[in-house]
């Protein structure tokens, strides 16, 4: 008989177990170079996250000073169903600063790779173990709910990683976070790392992914598949360097996979637009889920298929209505004659065969020059120009 691997009691028995999303837009997202939120913006973002059903909101770093602590208190005051969380370094003074905010939940970031321990802290593994035990125990005794984050976990010794998880658990921590701080994992490595920790860690596991290789969303899904019960995200993927796993992408992908998140998908676009304005980071039209153009079709073959049966070019899990959106048919270089005829008719313009034959080449030239889709007024102008040329 084969021996079964030990299984933590919290490990989901079903691959469809729900996943809690922990948003860090107001902390890690604001660490994006050049991004800074006002207090009013922070409160508005926190309220929007709460309305969207996000489970936890990291609201700031108390050690930054009294102004930041005042912001944290103001933001925490509007959170009723979403739990506010503050972020601390592995320092007693950070814990003291956190206690002045009145926030119960706090997260302690712990460097766990040899490079970060020696170069950043100037310490060794024994010092880190001792510090984690003392600070987590002190915070727990003070009434805080403490999560511990393993920074640079993807480059850490796996045995030391497991050891820190056990030290944190014994000291009173409620969750253990695996941070791919440099964004170096791929989904296969993320699944392996998280799965290894989940089977050895006595705590629920959270995954925090960065997007340096463009795989933060995929890595987050792999982590959930491996047993992570919580995923760290930011709106629009804001974050240092290439950013973090995007809330809207992770929520949509998990729901499509049958994993409940508690997030109202129809709220994501408004939330995304709010953060885009507050951060000064406009969205790409092709940003998955929330970009202006992600439910727009121009290619004649695709448009023809959609008109006959939406399922030809649309997944049931990605119907625009799920996100409070609708389809848009764009007219441009790749439009078919039928699509152009439909657009002309809707604009009250002639759509006979002769008009289409004359207008199609002009439309393609116009699209190559203007680099955009044609609006009804553009079609009218093109038609007028063709009529004038024909005289």
Swiss-Prot record:
CDD domains the record matches: DRE_TIM_NifV
Q: Does the keyword Transferase apply?
A: yes
One Pfam assignment? HMGL-like
Native source organism of the sequence: Cereibacter sphaeroides
The family annotation for this protein states: Belongs to the alpha-IPM synthase/homocitrate synthase family.
Q: Which domain of life is it from?
A: Bacteria
SUPFAM superfamilies in alphabetical order: Aldolase
State the UniProt keywords alphabetically: Nitrogen fixation, Transferase
Q: Give the matching Gene3D superfamilies.
A: 1.10.238.260, Aldolase class I
Enzyme nomenclature, EC number: 2.3.3.14
Output the lineage of the source organism: Bacteria, Pseudomonadati, Pseudomonadota, Alphaproteobacteria, Rhodobacterales
Q: What does this protein do?
A: This protein is a Fe-Mo-cofactor biosynthetic component.
Q: What does it catalyze?
A: acetyl-CoA + 2-oxoglutarate + H2O = (2R)-homocitrate + CoA + H(+)
Keyword Transferase tagged: yes
Known InterPro entries for this protein?
A: AIPM/Hcit_synth_CS, Aldolase_TIM, LeuA/HCS_post-cat, NifV/FrbC, PYR_CT
Protein name from the UniProt record? Homocitrate synthase
Pyruvate carboxyltransferase domain: residues covered = 19-269
List, in alphabetical order, the GO biological process terms annotated in this UniProt record. biosynthetic process; carboxylic acid metabolic process; nitrogen fixation
Query: What top-level class of enzyme does the UniProt entry assign?
Result: transferase
One GO MF term, please? Answer: homocitrate synthase activity
């Amino acid at each position: 008989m084969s021996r079964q691997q030990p299984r933590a009691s919290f490990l989901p028995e079903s691959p469809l177990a729900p996943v809690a999303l922990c948003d860090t837009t107001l902390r890690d997202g604001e660490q994006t170079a050049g991004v800074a939120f006002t207090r009013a913006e922070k409160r508005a973002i926190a309220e929007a996250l709460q309305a969207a059903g996000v489970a936890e909101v990291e609201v700031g770093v108390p050690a930054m000073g009294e102004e930041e602590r005042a912001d944290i208190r103001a933001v925490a005051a509007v959170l009723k169903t979403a739990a506010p969380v503050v972020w601390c370094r592995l320092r007693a003074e950070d814990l003291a600063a956190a206690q002045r905010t009145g926030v119960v939940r706090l997260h302690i970031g712990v460097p766990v790779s040899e490079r970060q321990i020696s170069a950043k802290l100037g310490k060794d593994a024994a010092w880190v173990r001792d510090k984690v035990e003392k600070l987590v125990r002190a915070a727990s005794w003070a009434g805080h709910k403490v999560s511990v984050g393993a920074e640079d976990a993807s480059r850490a010794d796996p045995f030391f990683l497991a050891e820190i998880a056990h030290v944190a658990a014994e000291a009173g921590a409620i969750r253990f976070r695996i941070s791919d701080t440099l964004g170096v994992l791929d989904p296969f490595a993320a699944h392996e790392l998280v799965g290894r920790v989940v089977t050895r860690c006595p705590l629920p596991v959270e995954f925090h992914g960065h997007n340096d290789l463009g795989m933060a969303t995929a890595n987050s899904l792999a982590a959930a598949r491996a047993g992570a019960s919580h995923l760290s995200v930011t709106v629009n993927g804001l974050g240092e360097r290439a950013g973090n796993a995007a809330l809207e992408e992770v929520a949509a992908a998990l729901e499509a996979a049958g994993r409940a998140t508690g997030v109202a998908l129809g709220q994501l676009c408004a939330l995304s637009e709010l953060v885009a304005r507050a951060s000064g980071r406009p969205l790409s039209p092709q940003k998955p889920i929330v970009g202006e153009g992600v439910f727009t079709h121009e290619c004649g073959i695709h448009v023809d298929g959609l008109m006959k049966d939406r399922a030809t070019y649309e997944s049931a899990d990605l119907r625009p209505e799920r996100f409070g959106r609708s389809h848009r048919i764009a007219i441009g270089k790749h439009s078919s004659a039928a699509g152009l005829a439909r657009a002309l008719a809707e604009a009250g313009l002639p759509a006979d065969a002769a008009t289409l034959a004359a207008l199609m080449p002009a439309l393609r030239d116009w699209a190559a020059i203007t680099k955009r889709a044609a609006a009804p007024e553009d079609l009218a102008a093109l038609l007028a120009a063709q009529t004038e040329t024909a005289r």
